[in-house]
Amino acid sequence: TVLVRSGAADAAVAGATRSTADVLRAGLKVLGVAPGVEVVSSCFLMVLADGRPVAYGDCGVVPDPDVSQLATIASSTADTWTGLAGPVSGGGSPRVAMLSFSTKGSAEHPRVDKVRAATALVADRRPDLTVDGELQFDAAMVPSVAAVKAPGSPVAGAADVFVFPDLDSGNIAYKVTERLGGARAYGPLLQGLDG
């Protein structure tokens, strides 16, 4: 992190012998939080079995984000995807799916309301991003499911960035995708540090 702070490096690789929490503490102490970023979070770059890169956020830092934090996680993860996977995916803006156990009103619950509110906040803060929610994972990922559950969505069935509503779901999802789905997982990639 000292080399990143001094400008001698663009990024740092850490964590082989330390926990994510230790790496995060060092990053915060040396780099601090980037201006305009509300919360430091993480994402995993997942290279699926078919070779397609997607990003999962947050899978390692914020246990139960509030609406504003969830919106920040979505923006940060979209920016990380754009910087790392966008060039190998043909460029363009990522399609950001705000995930829930509900798709477009299929369920009502305060947790669904949180995802809806965060989706609206991302759209307001970042009109340059293509974002939609609330979406179940299958509606965000599978075109045939999207056609039934979320017709007309600019994201459903074609998401590049998957934003999970809490750390439980994000952490479990990346491990299931890696272990059962045969994906390669790269991360956690810390995002929101000033460096």
Listing of model-derived features with the role each one plays in the protein:
Residues 1-156, 160-195:
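Anion-binding alpha/beta catalytic cores of soluble intermediary-metabolism enzymes, centered on
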